[in-house]
Amino acid sequence: MPNMRHRVNSLTEEHEENMQMSKLTGHLSSISTLFPVKNDASQTLTLGQLGLGCPCQLVSLWHYLRKNSPSRAVNIKIFESQFDALADFNLKLASLTSPDPRLPRDDEQSTMVEALLRADIVAIEGCQRLIFDDGRVILDIYLGDTLSQLKCILPTSVKGDMTDNSALIAHWNITEKVKAGSLDQAMLWQIAKLSRDNAALSFTDPESKETRQMMALARSVGLRTLETTVSETTVPETQQQTENKNLDTASDAIPLQERRALRHAQSDKFQYCPVSAANEGDEDCDGEIAIIGGGVASTHLALSLAQRNKKVRIFCSDANFAQQASGNKQGAVYPLLTPDNGHLSHYFQQGYLFTRRRLQALVDDKFAVSYDFCGVLQTGFDDRSSARLDKIINGQSWNEKMAYPIDAASATQIAGIDIDKAGIYYPLGGWICPHEFTRAAFDKAARLSDVSVEFNADITRIEQREGLWYLYKSVNVQHSCTDSHTPDDSEELEIGPFANLVLANGQGLTQFKQSEKLPATGFRGQVSHIPSRNALTKLSTVLCSHGYLTPGNNNFHCTGASYVKNPTNLDYCATEQVENLHKIRHSYVDKPWTEDVDITGHSARVGVRMVTRDHAPMMGCAPDTDSMLAQYEQHQHTKESIKFWKETPAPTHKGLFILGGLGSRGLTSGPLAAEALAAQLCGEVIPLSMPMLEMLNPNRFWMRKLIKGKAL
């Protein structure tokens, strides 16, 4: 006799699967109505979702978008308040790698599942950006209290006008696990704030009393509601509520005005931190964005812009990429954590994960980048530094993929050589070859869009005329006269115009009149190249202490680096070479393997990293410091001045942007800053919280004081 219980359970599971797929099909049908008849590939379609939901739904949506709108960029923003939901999501995602043998194999969807698994979403608070299909599908995962996450997102506009909401979320999917108690009116107002005026919410369980309550609340804030109904024969039908088919302008006008007022109120409170999109320019500019620089910052910005089909022109002062601070053979990648896990710490964690994913995408595309995510082991080198590390690791319940404490024995086991010190281990960390990472980013960008570079372009000054930017470089003029003793002259060559210009030129960031007051300081760093020999060959992780030491690559290790403020030259320095050796021996006292660190070959590389006082990069609109200081003369530090600085738009050089001050961890912080600036330039919702945008804004060193009524 057949096992009837097993048969009933099987039929029940099959019925539930059919119901889920039918609901999904209805959801996809509602999304399809958002695509215009004539596909506009220049505008990103932004979708929102509450709850991680089922991974098969996400994969199916991705597959649907790839099939039905392959040239249209789509940004999906998913908000999940429960960290435990991520573990369940990952388990279900992993199960999709073993497809049901009863169903036909879909290699394309299998590839998508593998890509999501390799993205390795980590359960940390804030936004993690995942980029697929060369930027056509962007997935933003917001973890943590959903209301708090929504409140910290700045609504943006392509044209800088809050009435233009085309860049905001067009459609929301409310997953089944979202309950009425959590989707209250406060959250719905925040959803409405981030949504287009005609945005809709779809619910997959519209018949329940709880869902009906949520739908009524949604309509009270002016959001349309869609429902997916499923018949017993599992034929899907997406229908809009009858009362929503023809919007009652009288009843909807008030909530629509209130939503716009919310956006304006949030924008008004952020006047001191300008977040402007790129200028539209005119026909002479051809939409081309100019970037000065040739390192990690400039090329990764070019790649992020190329993924948005932008035309980019890079001006590099050297004969090739990565001849400055980005030219080292190996650079450590690990987050900067703080005991309070504040905004700086959150930014570096998100940047750390973004860099890993950006690198993986380039490697998957067969670009040659040397790297090894072998982990990073950080230990103290004296009582003070050891106490600092203890304070960091014990100050928070860090996710174990991010960092965890290890004892002395474990440190030795992980490193492969005798460490015998407790410390912090960053399991996803490691090292990347910066100059190869830089070159790969440019090559990928040039493959995707009209991205070009001009080498040996030493830009000596920049100038704005009639809202457009012009660049000037010196060129030698050879004389044709017979007198060979007549010296060649130098004259200025004008390049431009450009509607938008980005300064991403590392140590040259402050060389122009418009940027000379930016408080970023150059620090010389000499990195020593050590032959791999004896015990050093066993080193299996990056060591960070007073100095750092990488595992071998091409029979060499990197160690260093020196830290000399405002250097006068970039020549090799024997003293700094010895200092690098002493740092290693100071960090690991009396360890025999330190005797294998050989600096006698005098092999090293010198670069200058630009460092800010607060260790955060600079990203955003270039402040007009002359105008700011002139206003300061009129509004000295009083209670009235606080109101002025908070409510008055901070002066900027329109069309000029800053990307620099990456410091010693540019590999960790740079690519995400570049991606965020690209989103800002294109008028998209930036994948950083408002406090982070404030932290990165180049004007922060003045505004932090001014909005508190303090003297500069």
From Swiss-Prot:
List the residue ranges of the region (tRNA (mnm(5)s(2)U34)-methyltransferase): 1-268
Q: What is its main location?
A: cytoplasm
Give the location in the cell.
Cytoplasm
- Could you say which EC number(s) this protein's record lists? 2.1.1.61, 1.5.-.-
Instruction: Output the Gene Ontology terms for molecular function.
Output: flavin adenine dinucleotide binding; oxidoreductase activity, acting on the CH-NH group of donors; tRNA (5-methylaminomethyl-2-thiouridylate)(34)-methyltransferase activity
**Alphabetically ordered keywords of this record:** Cytoplasm, FAD, Flavoprotein, Methyltransferase, Multifunctional enzyme, Oxidoreductase, S-adenosyl-L-methionine, Transferase, tRNA processing
In terms of InterPro entries, this protein maps to: FAD-dep_OxRdtase, FAD/NAD-bd_sf, SAM-dependent_MTases_sf, tRNA_MAMT_biosynth_bifunc_MnmC, tRNA_S-uridine_synth_MnmC_C
Task: Tell me the Pfam families matching this sequence.
Answer: DAO (PF01266)
Q: Would I find tRNA processing among this entry's keywords?
A: yes
GO cellular-component terms in the record? Answer: cytoplasm
So which cofactors does this thing need?
Answer: FAD
Q: Where is this region: FAD-dependent cmnm(5)s(2)U34 oxidoreductase?
A: 292-712
Q: Which GO terms describe its biological process?
A: methylation; tRNA wobble uridine modification
Reactions mediated catalytically: 5-aminomethyl-2-thiouridine(34) in tRNA + S-adenosyl-L-methionine = 5-methylaminomethyl-2-thiouridine(34) in tRNA + S-adenosyl-L-homocysteine + H(+)
- Family annotation (SUPFAM superfamilies): FAD/NAD(P)-binding domain (SSF51905)
What the entry lists under PANTHER family is as follows:
SARCOSINE DEHYDROGENASE-RELATED, TRNA 5-METHYLAMINOMETHYL-2-THIOURIDINE BIOSYNTHESIS BIFUNCTIONAL PROTEIN MNMC
Family per similarity comment: In the N-terminal section; belongs to the methyltransferase superfamily. tRNA (mnm(5)s(2)U34)-methyltransferase family. In the C-terminal section; belongs to the DAO family.
What is known about what this protein does? Answer: Catalyzes the last two steps in the biosynthesis of 5-methylaminomethyl-2-thiouridine (mnm(5)s(2)U) at the wobble position (U34) in tRNA. Catalyzes the FAD-dependent demodification of cmnm(5)s(2)U34 to nm(5)s(2)U34, followed by the transfer of a methyl group from S-adenosyl-L-methionine to nm(5)s(2)U34, to form mnm(5)s(2)U34.
What is this protein's record name? tRNA 5-methylaminomethyl-2-thiouridine biosynthesis bifunctional protein MnmC
Protein's organism: Shewanella sediminis (strain HAW-EB3)
Upper taxonomic lineage: Bacteria, Pseudomonadati, Pseudomonadota, Gammaproteobacteria, Alteromonadales
